[in-house]
């Protein structure tokens, strides 16, 4: 056999479908993280495994590691704490409020692209340092939990009192395909900006491969005023206000140093591009020893404080105590040092006790005193170190727990007793739950209320479909659909919503007078179930819709209006709601929403078909309602969509609205959106639609619709899992 001839027929090589058709709808994001990629098996319960963990023993091992410097990657100042804080920070710091994606909740820093981002240089070493501890405790602690816990122990080992720690983060086992990190194809590009400096939604970092901002200033321009603008925008998109932002930057930069000992061109490729013998490590440097005092990461060479392994107020002392002038690191990066040679000998060397240095600051550090609003906060925290410590503790806890959902999911002995507004609190159940007879009585009340099938189904869907699997926010529990801001969202049809809620509140009030109680949150879901039950009966099928009580009603005081505003759908294909044209198509937005709802492609398909015939469009239009008998739970949507007797033509310049006409007579039959027609256009979705359009599919359609509906209604019922 020729040496040049490959003996294998590659199963995954060659040109892909997306190479041929780059705009092909990506349905693969609906089928991630399945049992096929997870080695733990379906019977593994991480929460139960974590409960058996000796957390104190893990923390003791981590504490010992902090000062156990390894020759292959020596600890700065003899302490790994600052490196581990950066590891935890950069794990959590990818979170963005726009879609709830990113964050520390899945251990995604282990995989591409995050493991190879320019901002994460050397964090590959940090994870290898904690591998022996992960190995020791095995599946009782996830990588996601261990990374955050290590950051906490690092802070505690250097004299800081943290607010607490919660376990419960479940690892993923493959890179996330659903997260849009930006359209750039080069590291540190910033095509994400338009206009004067408008950052693309939902992104929360200024350049590809950065966690937040460029520490040298916007695009490397050392302008502290401009840097403040970027800081405020990016931290706000991670749910942090100005006070939290200042505390996080100042608190984080109380410890450790940056690394820019030499020419960054001498640093090798990132982990995903490194050679196989590097064994998953990257950024191998040929500058001298490449480690310790010769390390290069960001290219900046900054140590902020004289006590870089102890909690102190020295960051603010130095920030306010000197006038600063621009200089460059040995690697050529912009940074700042005190004017007129001040501060000489104040800063210890990280690896040579005989050397001393001057304090240094990043452009983004100086933004904290150049920006007037940041300066006021910085000065207050400088003058009140106890307040600084308290705000940093709370902000750090929020940073590292923001994407975990409600505190009912939190595990372990160190969970704080205090519940915070950003956790979207819901009162605990304080009454016996309704029994089967109560549910039957309530169903009869709903049926006799005068509310239509469409109204109750649309309201229940609006309540439950706010859920985001990315950060486990939203959902039907809490009945926040009756509160600001959700009650006023156009997609929720405020007038119809107010009508439905008034009727349901009356039923609730009357029932609760009997001595038993049902929450409005439960009643909204139950009403939706009643609507589906009636619609199935209209179609000649008797069904039982699963309903599990146990939801409670949140108050307006427990609901941060600004925080919940980001959950408002800009589009919702399930309700044919597309008020604005975007650069991405309506069908792409549908798939994105389906992914946030943790739906598979079949579940998304059957829900669309059912919601259309139940007449639940947000604008009450007949777009996509391919049936002559609305409010009958039939497979008519699929039957009529796939009818070759209909031809379609766009009726809008944007080609987002269509008319279906009789192929022979030309008479109008239906109107449709792109979301409707994609189920006949996309080959994979058409294959699913054909299943439900078949003559023997009516019962399967109803069963599958009910299963998918029940899943959505219970997405935030963590107590049932």
Swiss-Prot record:
Entry PTM: Formation of the three residue Trp-Tyr-Met cross-link is important for the catalase, but not the peroxidase activity of the enzyme.
Active-site residues from the entry: 90
GO cellular component, one term: cytosol
GO molecular function: catalase activity; heme binding; metal ion binding
Chain sites annotated for binding heme b: 253
Site location (Transition state stabilizer): 86
Known EC number: 1.11.1.21
Listed cofactors: heme b
Catalytic activity as recorded in UniProt: H2O2 + AH2 = A + 2 H2O; 2 H2O2 = O2 + 2 H2O
Crosslinked residue numbers (Tryptophyl-tyrosyl-methioninium (Tyr-Met) (with W-89)): 212-238
Keyword Ribonucleoprotein: no
Tryptophyl-tyrosyl-methioninium (Trp-Tyr) (with M-238) cross-link, chain position(s): 89-212
Oligomeric and partner information: Homodimer or homotetramer.
Protein name per Swiss-Prot or TrEMBL: Catalase-peroxidase
Organism: Shewanella baltica (strain OS195)
């Amino acid at each position: 056999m020729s040496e040049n001839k490959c003996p294998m027929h590659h199963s995954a090589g060659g040109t892909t479908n997306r190479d041929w058709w780059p705009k092909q709808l990506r349905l693969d994001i609906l089928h991630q993280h399945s049992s096929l990629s997870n080695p733990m098996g379906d019977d593994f319960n991480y929460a139960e495994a974590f409960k058996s963990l000796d957390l104190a023993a893990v923390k003791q091992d981590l504490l010992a590691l902090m000062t156990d410097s390894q020759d292959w990657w020596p600890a700065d100042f003899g302490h790994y704490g600052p490196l581990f804080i950066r590891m935890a920070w950069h794990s959590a710091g990818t979170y963005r409020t726009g879609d709830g994606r990113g964050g520390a909740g899945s251990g995604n820093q282990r995989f591409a692209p995050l493991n190879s981002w320019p901002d994460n240089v050397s964090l590959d070493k940090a994870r290898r340092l904690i591998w022996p501890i992960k190995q020791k405790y095995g599946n009782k602690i996830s990588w996601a939990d261990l990374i955050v816990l290590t950051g906490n122990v690092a802070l505690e080992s250097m004299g800081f009192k943290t607010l607490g720690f919660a376990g419960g983060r479940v690892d993923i086992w493959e890179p996330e395909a659903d997260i849009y990190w930006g359209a750039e194809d080069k590291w540190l590009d910033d095509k994400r900006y338009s206009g004067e400096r408008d950052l693309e939604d939902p992104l929360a970092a200024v350049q590809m491969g950065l966690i937040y901002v460029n520490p040298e200033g916007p695009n490397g321009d050392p302008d502290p005023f401009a840097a403040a603008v970027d800081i405020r925008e990016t931290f706000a998109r991670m749910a942090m206000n100005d006070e939290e932002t200042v505390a996080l930057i100042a608190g984080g930069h109380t410890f450790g140093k940056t690394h820019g000992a030499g020419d960054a061109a001498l640093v090798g490729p990132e982990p995903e591009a490194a050679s196989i013998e590097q064994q998953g490590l990257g950024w191998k440097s040929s500058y001298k020893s490449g480690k310790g005092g010769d390390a290069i990461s960001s290219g900046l060479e900054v140590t902020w404080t004289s006590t870089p392994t102890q909690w102190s107020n020295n960051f603010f002392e130095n920030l306010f105590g000197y006038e600063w002038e621009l200089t460059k690191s040995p690697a050529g990066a912009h940074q700042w040092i005190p004017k007129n040679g001040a501060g000489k000998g104040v800063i210890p060397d990280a690896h040579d006790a005989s050397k001393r240095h001057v304090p240094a600051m990043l452009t983004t550090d100086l933004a904290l005193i150049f920006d007037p609003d940041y300066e006021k906060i910085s000065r207050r925290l400088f003058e009140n170190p106890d307040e600084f410590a308290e705000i940093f503790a709370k902000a750090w806890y929020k940073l590292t727990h923001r994407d975990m959902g409600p505190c009912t999911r939190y595990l372990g002995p160190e969970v704080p007793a205090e519940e915070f507004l950003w956790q979207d609190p819901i009162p605990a159940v304080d009454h016996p739950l309704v029994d089967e007879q109560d549910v039957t009585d309530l169903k009869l009340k709903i049926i006799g209320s005068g509310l239509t099938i469409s109204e109750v189904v649309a309201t229940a869907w609006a309540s439950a479909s706010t859920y985001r699997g990315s950060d486990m926010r939203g959902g039907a529990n809490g009945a926040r659909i009756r509160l600001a801001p959700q009650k006023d969202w156009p997609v929720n049809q405020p007038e119809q919503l107010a009508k439905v809620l008034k009727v349901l509140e009356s039923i609730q009030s009357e029932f609760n007078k009997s001595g038993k109680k049902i929450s409005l949150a439960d009643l909204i879901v139950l009403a939706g179930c009643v609507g589906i039950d009636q619609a199935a009966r209209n179609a000649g099928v008797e069904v039982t819709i699963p309903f599990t009580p146990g939801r409670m009603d949140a108050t307006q005081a427990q609901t941060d209006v600004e925080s919940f505003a980001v959950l408002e759908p800009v589009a919702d294909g399930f309700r044919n709601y597309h008020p604005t044209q975007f650069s991405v198509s309506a069908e792409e937005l549908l798939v994105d929403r389906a992914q946030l709802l943790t739906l598979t492609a079949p579940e998304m398909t059957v829900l669309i078909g059912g919601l259309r015939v139940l007449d639940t469009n947000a604008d009450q239009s007949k777009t996509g309602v391919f049936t002559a008998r609305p409010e009958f739970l039939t497979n008519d949507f699929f039957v009529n969509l796939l009818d070759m007797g209909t031809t379609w033509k766009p009726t809008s310049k944007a080609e987002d609205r269509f008319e279906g006409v009789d192929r022979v007579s030309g008479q109008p039959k239906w109107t449709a959106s792109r979301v409707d027609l994609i189920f006949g256009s996309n080959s994979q979705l058409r294959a699913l639609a054909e299943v439900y359009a078949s003559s023997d599919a009516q019962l399967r359609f109803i069963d599958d619709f009910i299963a998918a509906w029940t899943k959505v209604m219970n997405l935030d019922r963590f107590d049932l899992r």
